[in-house]
């Protein structure tokens, strides 16, 4: 049934035509409109997404800028600026805007620790820092309400190691923060030990660490090994760290090796730990590290071995058995190492006659003799101390070996140096060598060592030293000449007063000696 109000097809066609639009044009227009609508919608969606992305990036940028401003404020030397930065940080933590994972990106933990330890700040600011550290770690402040600010800081940092052990960023920042406290005072070291930090460090060392984290850990362990003779903890608290040190010595990273060697050197000054170090063969591992041709940490390892030998003779035999002498023998004549190596050998010499026997049998002393003749003064000086220590044993075999080395000329040339200590040692060595020569007299009863020394000009040097202003050197030189170098050209006179003309004064003196005059009472 038709609609009377609806126009017919023809009429509609006329209407389209009157509007100059036919059916095809209308279809095209609708298609264009639809395309335009879809395009607009697509543009709107893109713009909306772009705005959302921009808003997110701006929000992140604003957060980063705010966090950066807080980090910069903590590095200020003005307490007002520091306090403002702490207030902003604490507020954002309360609002859970920032987490520990975000904060460690700018090393907030280390910066807070640096402010706490190295800035002149009020107790209020210290309290705020301790509360902030607890908040960052996610610890309830009420639980530690009665603790001191120092305890709160250390507790929160140790808590981070156990809680966030899988995050290298957090561990690195935490290790650096604890190191900051320990550098400030050994009291903080003992506080950390009371918080059972050693077990946490042992657990952290078992994970697969990056080089940066391993360096941070080894540096922290080294700080725990320093100054153990002051406010000493129990040895059982420190002994577990030796396993970390052992792994550090065998590391491929030079910085880790360096800190491990420094740790051993520091431990050598604390006798209670010697037994534990010996069980793990730490010094033997140091020697093995020194033997490694690819070790970039060789100078520090060498210095660590030197410090250990200086501090104690407990490990000398262990290191010699591990091949230390063979290693040093190869380094003695290396120009840039000879001084330090000769210094180590001179310290080894004082361990006793058996050690000197090993130095002789290994050929180390013969290499030292070459240093006496070829190297610059500082190396020759240390080599001379080696020879002096060998002579000081007074063992005939050692003295004979020194004479046979053929370096007495270079050795006695150092008598003209300005080092009073060295000259005194050399004079003592010459005296012992001349004593040895008296036991090996030639058929004409002459001292072969005295003859040899005189041939190389030693006697002239001794006569020169007799005029020294140093009483010690003067006495030593005069004693040697007086005993071993009698002047054969001087006329022998049994009576030193032969030809002396007596007079009346001599008679009076003799009479006074025979008959002493008794003092008479004084009277007016």
From Swiss-Prot:
Main localization (coarse): cytoplasm
One Gene Ontology CC term in the entry: cytoplasm
One of the GO biological process terms: protein import into nucleus
Span list, region Disordered: 1-42
Highest taxon of source: Eukaryota
Keyword annotations from UniProtKB, A to Z: Cytoplasm, Protein transport, Transport
MF terms in GO: nuclear import signal receptor activity; nuclear localization sequence binding
Transmembrane segments: none
Domain annotation IBB: ranges: 1-59
Compartment(s) of residence: Cytoplasm
Expression sites (tissue/organ): Adult germline tissues.
Quaternary data: Forms a complex with an importin beta subunit.
Function: Binds specifically and directly to substrates containing either a simple or bipartite NLS motif. Promotes docking of import substrates to the nuclear envelope. Seems to act as a cytosolic receptor for both simple and bipartite NLS motifs.
Domain description: Does not contain ARM repeats, but instead Ser charged repeats. May have specificity for cargos distinct from that of other importin alpha subunits.
Family: Belongs to the importin alpha family.
Record protein name field: Importin subunit alpha-1
Upper taxonomic lineage: Eukaryota, Metazoa, Ecdysozoa, Nematoda, Chromadorea
């Amino acid at each position: 049934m038709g609609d009377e109000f609806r126009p017919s097809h023809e009429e509609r066609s006329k209407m389209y035509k009157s509007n100059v639009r036919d059916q095809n044009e209308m279809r095209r227009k609708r298609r264009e409109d639809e395309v335009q609508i879809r395009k607009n919608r697509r543009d709107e969606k893109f713009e909306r997404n772009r705005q959302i992305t921009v808003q997110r990036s701006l929000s992140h940028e604003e957060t980063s800028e705010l966090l950066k401003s807080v980090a910069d404020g903590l590095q200020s030397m003005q307490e007002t600026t520091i306090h403002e930065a702490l207030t902003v940080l604490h507020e954002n933590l309360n609002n859970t805007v920032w987490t520990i994972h975000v904060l460690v990106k700018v090393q907030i933990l280390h910066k807070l620790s640096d402010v706490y330890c190295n800035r002149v700040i009020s107790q209020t600011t210290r309290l705020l820092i301790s509360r902030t550290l607890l908040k960052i770690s996610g610890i309830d402040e009420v639980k530690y309400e009665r603790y001191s600010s120092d305890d709160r800081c250390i507790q929160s940092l140790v808590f981070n190691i156990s809680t966030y052990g899988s995050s290298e960023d957090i561990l690195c920042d935490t290790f650096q923060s604890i190191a900051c406290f320990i550098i400030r005072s050994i009291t903080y070291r003992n506080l950390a030990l009371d918080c059972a930090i050693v077990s946490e460090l042992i657990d952290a060392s078992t994970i697969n660490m990056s080089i940066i984290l391993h360096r941070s850990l080894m540096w922290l362990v080294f700080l725990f090994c320093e100054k153990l003779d002051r406010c000493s903890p129990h040895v059982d608290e420190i002994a577990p760290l030796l396993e970390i040190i052992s792994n550090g010595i065998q590391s491929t990273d030079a910085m880790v090796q360096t800190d491990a060697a420094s740790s051993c050197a520091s431990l050598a000054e604390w006798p209670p730990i010697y037994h534990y170090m010996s069980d793990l063969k730490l010094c033997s591992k140091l020697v093995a590290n020194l033997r490694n041709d690819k070790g970039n940490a060789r100078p520090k390892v060498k210095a660590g071995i030197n410090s250990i030998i200086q501090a104690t003779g407990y490990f000398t035999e262990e290191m010699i058995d591990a091949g230390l002498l063979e290693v040093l023998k190869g380094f003695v004549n290396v120009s840039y190492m000879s001084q330090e190596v000769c210094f180590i050998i001179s310290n080894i010499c004082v361990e006793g006659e058996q050690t000197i026997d090993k130095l002789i049998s290994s050929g180390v002393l013969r290499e030292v003799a070459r240093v006496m003749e070829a190297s610059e003064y500082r190396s020759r000086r240390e080599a001379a101390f080696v020879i002096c220590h060998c002579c000081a044993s007074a063992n005939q075999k050692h003295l004979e070996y020194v004479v046979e080395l053929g370096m007495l000329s270079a050795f006695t040339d150092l008598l003209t140096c300005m080092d009073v200590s060295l000259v005194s040692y050399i004079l003592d060595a010459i005296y012992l060598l001349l004593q040895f020569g008296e036991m090996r007299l030639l058929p004409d009863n002459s001292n072969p060592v005295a003859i040899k020394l005189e041939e190389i000009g030693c006697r002239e040097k001794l006569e020169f030293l007799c005029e020294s202003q140093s009483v010690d050197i003067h006495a030593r030189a005069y004693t040697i000449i007086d005993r071993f170098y009698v002047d054969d050209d001087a006329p022998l006179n049994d009576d030193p007063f032969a030809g002396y003309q007596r007079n009346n004064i001599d008679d009076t003196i003799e009479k006074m000696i025979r008959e002493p005059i008794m003092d008479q009472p004084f009277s007016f």
